[in-house]
UniProtKB/Swiss-Prot annotation:
GO terms for biological process: translation. It is found in: Plastid, Chloroplast. With S4 and S5 plays an important role in translational accuracy. Located at the interface of the 30S and 50S subunits. Its main location: plastid. The keyword NAD does not apply. This is Small ribosomal subunit protein uS12c. Belongs to the universal ribosomal protein uS12 family. GO terms for molecular function: rRNA binding; structural constituent of ribosome. InterPro entries: NA-bd_OB-fold, Ribosomal_uS12, Ribosomal_uS12_bac. It comes from the Eukaryota. Keywords: Chloroplast, Plastid, Ribonucleoprotein, Ribosomal protein, RNA-binding, rRNA-binding. GO terms for cellular component: chloroplast; small ribosomal subunit. It comes from Cyanidium caldarium (Red alga). Part of the 30S ribosomal subunit.
Amino acid sequence: MPTIQQLIRFERKQIVGTSKSAALESCPQKKGVCTKVYTTTPKKPNSALRKVARVRLTSGFEITAYIPGIGHNLQEHSVVLIRGGRVKDLPGVRYHIIRGALDSTGVKNRLRARSKYGASKPKK
């Protein structure tokens, strides 16, 4: 515990918090180009092949982003839109690719939560 005199000489430093999605630079989304599209395995106790992409953003950052939904058309040099949001069982994956924007197509035959996966309304 500092004395009053010490507080007069050295004022308290504010604790600066770090961003959970630094590469977005306070923007809601960022555009980027896929440099590598691959699958990876989640940490214990889960088991799957999660689809992820390495993306170079327009801001110069190189990030790993998750590709949500069933099936995708992404490959190297695809232009994608990135939003924040981590994947809890994939360490280091702190961003999501927005489906249905730019080169990423929406999920086929998706009936519920369509807006989250860029799926169009089905024909009656």
